Amino acid sequence: MSHQLTFADSEFSTKRRQTRKEIFLSRMEQILPWQNMTAVIEPFYPKAGNGRRPYPLETMLRIHCMQHWYNLSDGAMEDALYEIASMRLFARLSLDSALPDRTTIMNFRHLLEQHQLARQLFKTINRWLAEAGVMMTQGTLVDATIIEAPSSTKNKEQQRDPEMHQTKKGNQWHFGMKAHIGVDAKSGLTHSLVTTAANEHDLNQLGNLLHGEEQFVSADAGYQGAPQREELAEVDVDWLIAERPGKVKTLKQNPRKNKTAINIEYMKASIRARVEHPFRIIKRQFGFVKARYKGLLKNDNQLAMLFTLANLFRVDQMIRQWERSQ
């Protein structure tokens, strides 16, 4: 496929000021290990034959990444390729040749879902980060977040998604799913991900979030009782689990007497604060606030891709912080 620029594209590429989107895409161009990622998908990707020639795999992967960075539907992604030159150039496309339509973009997503390739990408990238010395193993921070799903029954099936469930948090009811994550305490990178319906108790998935090499586990008060769970009896770690808010409030009523206990709670809070970084990236940076698809499998695929990209975004943040400190 030709990468030759049209007049409009070449005019755009020579303009002086870079937009925030251009700067972001340029950073992602440099940080993503494209060869490692395409190697995961290549065995399953259609080969050129007698039929319609498929778009280059890396082009479709780049489009798929942009969908997640900018929270775009298949149709919105097709429109963006026509309307936004920086996104078209990032995908190595130009207006002088055919651009992938929404069906082609959707079929690529379905390919990843069918073979659970987003999960494989998550593992591949994390292995690459561990080999590079970025992902450590000393400690794991765990947390879970509720992801809302459409609760309306005004659809073709006239029912809510049967794989999503209702749960109460505080005084508010939520309908949807949960993303449970295990995060490297040193770097803030996500090493484990489990998706469930929203009514699943956080503690039930704790064992699936540990990699087995950590020396300590940090969590909020929702994980109280973890050391007593039968499935965690053999886990030999220091449990840094926050006390329940009521107990902390009682401690603060006599701060002089309980100074040490209060300081320990502050220490626990400062350690586990980093677990919020991945959620902040996918929600605020990438704009992911609601389950887009029906069923846990499709949404698990999207979340695995989001956390893969969030890890790489976090590495880019770390590199830029280091550069500023020099």
UniProtKB/Swiss-Prot annotation:
Molecular function terms, GO-annotated: DNA binding; transposase activity
A biological process from GO: DNA transposition
Family matches, as Pfam families: DDE_Tnp_1, DUF772
Keywords, in A-Z order: DNA recombination, DNA-binding, Transposable element, Transposition
N-terminal signal peptide: none
GO CC terms: cytosol
Superkingdom of origin organism: Bacteria
Family membership noted in the UniProt record: Belongs to the transposase 11 family.
Function: Involved in the transposition of the insertion sequence IS5.
Protein name as annotated: Transposase InsH for insertion sequence element IS5Y
Gene expressing this chain: insH5
